[in-house]
């Protein structure tokens, strides 16, 4: 049984995925986990592999969902990305980027491309 928070998260990820597909991205996988990290969506934008963090906030009066990706969360995402690339033997073979999709309770979507800088 899923908690209400998990259901809200799943719905936000589904909404983000549909939105990004309408923008031309292709779905690869979702909820890729490694140790303490998880990448919500992995998609492709032509020849670029896109790792996507989806953030939802019911109350966004004080802070936008996108602003909730902390430096610690960014480090975990990067470690998870590297594991994905190594596992699939893609390291140094494909261009990648990290995007963040923020969704508010009134379904406003903010998509930030290249939101997290990664240096290999």
UniProtKB/Swiss-Prot annotation:
GO molecular function annotations of the record: nucleic acid binding
Pfam families in the cross-refs: UPF0102
Domain of life assignment: Bacteria
Residue spans crossing the bilayer: none
NCBIfam families (UniProt xref): PRK12497.1-3 (NF009150), PRK14684.1 (NF011277), YraN family protein (TIGR00252)
HAMAP family named in the record: UPF0102 (MF_00048)
UniProt record similarity statement: Belongs to the UPF0102 family.
Protein name: UPF0102 protein CbuK_0265
